[in-house]
């Protein structure tokens, strides 16, 4: 997989959320939970992935096309999103 992003959006995300898009690959190499983001009509297929970045559950908004993942944002998961993530792996 190749990871791409808009550099201005990356810098904005670091300031706003404290997470760097460069670290997205680390999240996707671990255990993840992905759903389709159909909250709005984005004119493209968007996904929300929950995963671990070091010891923090994060939410990554992204698109996927062939072998390319375009990162839109990364932020710390809310308490509810953390529950969803951990519940998904506790059968």
What are the language-model segments listed below?
Residues 1-91:
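Ribonuclease/tRNase effector modules and their secretory precursors
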């Amino acid at each position: 997989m190749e990871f791409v992003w808009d550099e201005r959006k990356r810098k904005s995300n670091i300031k706003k959320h404290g997470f760097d898009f460069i670290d997205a690959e680390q999240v996707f190499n671990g255990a993840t939970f992905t759903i389709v983001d159909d909250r709005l009509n984005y004119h493209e297929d968007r996904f929300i992935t929950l995963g671990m970045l070091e010891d923090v559950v994060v939410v990554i908004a992204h698109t996927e096309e062939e072998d390319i993942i375009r990162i839109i944002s990364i932020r710390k998961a809310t308490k509810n999103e953390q529950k969803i993530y951990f519940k998904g792996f506790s059968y």
